[in-house]
Amino acid sequence: MQMNKAVEMTDPAKSLEDMVLDHHRSQLALCDRLERLADSLPDKYDPQECLSISWQLYPAVKSAHKFEEEELFPKLLEPGQSRGDIEKSIERLKFEHWEDESSAEDISMFLRQMISHPSTTDIGKMSYMLRGFFDGIRRHIAFETEYLLPKLREIQ
């Protein structure tokens, strides 16, 4: 069983960019685990891995989003910074955060249900939810990497 801990919110020894990248790595590792789980459905999944993911998913996603909304986004929106379309992009990302957190809660609940009551769980729905979630997280991270991190480098 692989463990993923939520990344520490702030670390004074690290740059803001390094902390963003730490959160990205943590979330991408969870996405890889979710993809392996989706590939193992319907009958080759590891119940312990499901349980582990179910307890780690929401806290990891919430921690990354809290960090972005309290540390990264305010830095990018500081007065005097060249903003361009960044305000619209950040608003969209905040909305995606809400959607991702809601999906993470749903997935966690379904994973626990799948372990405790496998005969009542719609495995096809579970696989679809997992794939939609990890694809969305990966796209979100790719956008932040390609658009927000270069903006952050310009102002640091």
Which residue stretches match the model-derived regions?
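Small-residue-biased structural context
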Residues: 1-156
